[in-house]
């Protein structure tokens, strides 16, 4: 069995005139990263590999999650190929994962994440929002063979905010 946790990077800032890959988290993104990461500990596998896009906003999201979940920062593997908005490229990267890893936690981007969870999960999600968390379990033993999985947990910042 394989377990995949997809986390969309938190809300980024558009204030500074920087290249897309260099955009940093907005204050709301920082707040939402803390909010979600402080509420998912019980849903996470004990052992895992953590991958993040090399985009600044994804990396900052991953670091906040790591700090709140007490993951060593050096356990985050930053992968250029995760800086993609294309679900077929995301799928290719996931399917290339070593089978010795049962659990993958991935910080990435939309539209790739929403399209991936709708292709491989069993619950339709119109849009995975920033800082959104989706967990999918697959019965296959090989990442390269994953097909239809079961969506086991969905948690979005709006689920944790009370007016």
Where are these regions (language model features)?
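A polyampholytic, Gly/Pro-enriched intrinsically disordered region
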Residues: 95-105, 147-158
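Active-site-proximal alpha-helix that buttresses catalytic centers in soluble enzyme cores
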Residues: 2-82, 113, 123-128
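Short phosphate-binding loop-to-helix
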Residues: 82-98
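Short, Lys/Arg-enriched, disordered terminal segments
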Residues: 1-2, 163
């Amino acid at each position: 069995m394989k377990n995949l946790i997809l986390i969309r990077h938190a809300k980024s800032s558009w204030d500074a005139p920087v290249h897309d890959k260099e955009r940093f988290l907005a204050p709301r993104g920082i707040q939402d990263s803390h909010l979600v990461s402080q509420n998912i500990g019980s849903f996470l596998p004990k052992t895992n590999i953590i991958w993040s896009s090399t985009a600044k906003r994804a990396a900052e999201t991953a670091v906040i999650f790591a700090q709140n979940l007490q993951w060593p920062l050096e356990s985050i593997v930053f992968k250029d190929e995760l800086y993609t908005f294309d679900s077929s490229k995301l799928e290719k990267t996931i399917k290339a994962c070593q089978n010795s890893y049962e659990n993958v936690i991935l910080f990435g981007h939309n539209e790739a994440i929403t399209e991936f969870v709708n292709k491989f999960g069993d619950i339709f999600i119109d849009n995975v929002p920033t800082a959104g968390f989706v967990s999918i379990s697959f019965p296959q033993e090989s990442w390269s063979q994953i097909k239809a999985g079961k969506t086991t947990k969905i948690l979005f910042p709006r689920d944790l905010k009370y007016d």
